Amino acid sequence: MAHAVRALWPHGRAVAWRLGDRPALGLHAQGRAGFTRAAGGSGPAATARKGGPRLLGAAALALGGALGLYHTARWHLRAQDLRAERSASQLSLSSRLQLTLYQYKTCPFCSKVRAFLDFHALPYQVVEVNPVRRAEIKFSSYRKVPIVMAQEGESLQQLNDSSVIISALKTYLVSGQPLADIITYYPPMKAVNDQGKEVTEFCNKYWLMLDEKEAQRMYGGKEARTEEMKWRQWADDWLVHIISPNVYRTPAEALASFDYIVKEGNFGTVEGAMAKYVGAAAMYFISKRLKRRHHLRDDVREDLYEAANKWVAAVGKDRPFMGGQKPNLADLAVYGVLRVMEGLEAFDDLMRHTHIQPWYLRVEKAIAEAPQ
C-alpha cells in the first residue's frame, strides 16, 4: 500500500515594394525631361512624343509594382518552404522513434511527460503500472515512473526522470543527434537527501544539448533559455510538492482523490477497494507531514494560489505563454503538474481564486491542436 499511495504523489514586404518603386521613379524623371524637350513641337509627331513618356512611365510603374508583388510572394513562399522543411524534418525524426511510456496516470511527473509528447505530436504507447506490484517495470533497476523506452532503429534506450526524458527528446528533435549519444549527457548521480535516504539525481537535466545556432534558433537569446530552465526547476522543486497536501487536505478530499486514482489506475478489484479507503486515510495523515516538511501554511490552498499567481505574473500580460506565441518546456511542465488535479475540489478552487485559468486554457488548446 505504501507504493499505491505514490500514484498521485510520486516522489519583408516593405523592401519588395521599394524594389518596385525605384525603377518607376527613375523612368518618370526621364519622361519629364523628354516632355520638356518636345514642348516646342507641334502636330501629330509632337503629340506622340508628348504621350510616349507618359505611357512609358505608367508601364514602368506597373512593372515596378508587379516586380514588388513578385518579390513579396517569393519571400512568403520561401518562408513557407522553410517552415515546411523544418516540420518535415521534425516529422522524419519523430517517425524514427517508437516510444513507450510507463506511468501512473495521476502522477504529476508522468503528466508532464504526456503534455510534452502530445504537444510535439510524438506517437507513444502507454503502459499503466500497477502501483502495488509494479510488475510492468520489473525489467528496470530504476523503480520510479515515468520511464520511457525509446526504440531508434536497432537501438533501444531507457530514459528515466521526467525532466531528463523531456530534455533528451527535445534535444533529439532540434538537433537530430542520435538518442544514444544524447542520453550520455545526462548521467545519473547518487546523492543523499534531507531525510538521509539515498536518491538518484541526474546532471544537466534542465539543459538542452544544442550548439550555438540551434540554441539561437530555438530561444532567440540567453535570457529566454535561462528563464525556461528556472521555471522548469521551480515546477519540480516547489509546485509539485504543493499538489499532494491540497488534494488530500481533508478526509473527504482524500477519499475523492483515491476514488479518481483507482478509476484511472491499474488496480485489481481487491487492490482498488483497499487503495480507495486505506490509501485515502494514509495519505490524509501523510499530507500533514508533507505540509510541515515543505513549510506550507495551515491552509495549504493559500500556497497553491500564491504559486499559481506567481507563475501568471512571470508569464506577464504581453505574451500568451512563457515561450511567447507557443508554449515552451516551462509552460508544458507547469500545465502537466496542475492537470492531475482536474476533476477534484482543489482544481476547481484554483481556477476560481487565481488568475491562471486563461493561460491554462490556452495551453490546453495548443496541445489539443497539435498536428497528429
Whereabouts are the PLM-identified features?
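GST-like domain detector, emphasizing the conserved glutathione-binding G-site
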Residues: 3-9, 13-20, 26-28, 36-268
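A positional/structural detector of protein chain ends, strongest at the extreme C-terminus
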Residues: 1-3, 371-372
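C-terminal helix/juxtamembrane-tail motif
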Residues: 361-372
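GST-like fold's C-terminal all-alpha helical module
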Residues: 6-7, 194-358
